[in-house]
């Protein structure tokens, strides 16, 4: 639960090895020691390294096993996150899979893996988290969507379609939870230089995880429901969304 002056005291990260999520946790915690963080992710070196980095910043870190490809892990993981420690102030839904885009539109298994991780698991976790936050009577959800969901592009339309669905769900969840006083912040970043995008050509308006974290923190504090990172990406995507198909398909995107 937030402290007497409204500072966040406990954060849960579903997808606890995400570069953007870790940068956001550091930004939300500021320099205050003792903030409690639960990292829900697959066990391994990446989760251990993430935990160590946050502990070095003065946070109290716990780890929970969670695998977005394993349907049986969702209830167990989220129950563990909520049933140990203080009330949860913020839950970040930060797991995701970029995948091989050329394979994804030609291979059923590759396509379904993207759907399972980016959409089905995200929806299931949203339902479970919403129930927990309603039960405790407060909290916020940060849902990591993507600008890729705004309009299908030849280069990543399978990934983009899963993010479009995830985005719609969390936008609607925000409507549903408004009466309970629970904020749902949908984050639509453009290209972010992270481990997931390593090896890809850097796109215009690319950002670091720390830059995205600043946008997220500001949006959360302001009570926003949607933020773009960088903010100018909103206008770029608005233009692209309204271009005629004959023009859009000639663009190198």
Residue ranges and their predicted role:
Residues 126, 162:
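Active-site helix of classical SDR
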